[in-house]
Amino acid sequence: MDQLVPAERYSPYRFFSAEDWAKFRADTPLTLTEDEVRRLRSLNDPVNLEEVRRIYLSMSRLLSAHVEASQLLFQQRQVFFDSDHAVKTPFIIGIAGSVAVGKSTTARVLKELLTRWPSSPKVDLITTDGFLLPNAVLSHEGLMERKGFPESYDVGAILRFLSGIKAGLPNMRAPIYSHLTYDVVPGEFAVIDRPDILIFEGINVLQTRDLPRDGKAVPFVSDFFDFSIYIDAPEELIHEWYVDRFMRLRETAFRDPNSFFHRYSTLPEVEARTIAEELWTNINLKNLRENILPTRPRADLILRKGTNHLVQEVALRKL
């Protein structure tokens, strides 16, 4: 049973412990192996097959119900308009949350689970990293220290991409981002061709912006979502995960001479950790408090993590 304490009766969410949430899996089959989960998870994210059983299978079942309801509504609208020429549009899932909280792992695991539904839907995954302005532009505008903040994204390009996806247009292109060079890759794109489901993941996907004074309509990125997920965790844990990940990257990816952060791989450990702490405090913590955490109440589903990246509580928006 969900925990309906008095203060939560007035919440738009129903709250479940991870153990109670796991029961909603029902007969949803586990279609991933331990090796596949290991391949899908991000650096420093220890999610395993047991966590897939506890949390992700119930999520998969819930999303299946939402997709089926969307398909039924589409059919009913065809009857309403007495038309069989309508273009079926993809079901879009948005995934938001802080840097280092585990968004990418969640997105990749969900993609694999959804792809393996009995209906075998075509599922694509795009991150907002590719929609960051190129480093040359950020440097010219003095925004390199604000990378990841709302103003560092080409929001117009995001909206055009999602508009095309929702319009059912073929071969929509999304820019590709390199975490090695820490920049958008010039001239390279992921081509998304009318998927059944699109997962759109990034720290900024639930953010709103100020309405224009001239009264013109301005869509938000989340206006295109059929379902949204926020990955949550206590601030001190995200801090710990960010610094730990930085230090592990220092021993791995940063050692590549082509890495934007290669210079950090040669620093003494104490100095490198100091830099990681400064990056967290001056950039990522500030962005979390100002722009990311305030969007949490806009999500349909909130996964609250505890130690070891394990989900401890799930909040599902009431219908």
UniProtKB/Swiss-Prot annotation:
This is Pantothenate kinase. It comes from Chelativorans sp. (strain BNC1). ATP binds at residues 97-104. Gene3D superfamilies: P-loop containing nucleotide triphosphate hydrolases. Keywords: ATP-binding, Coenzyme A biosynthesis, Cytoplasm, Kinase, Nucleotide-binding, Transferase. The keyword Nucleotide-binding applies. The gene is coaA. InterPro entries: P-loop_NTPase, PanK, PRK/URK. It is found in: Cytoplasm. It holds the Pfam family PRK.
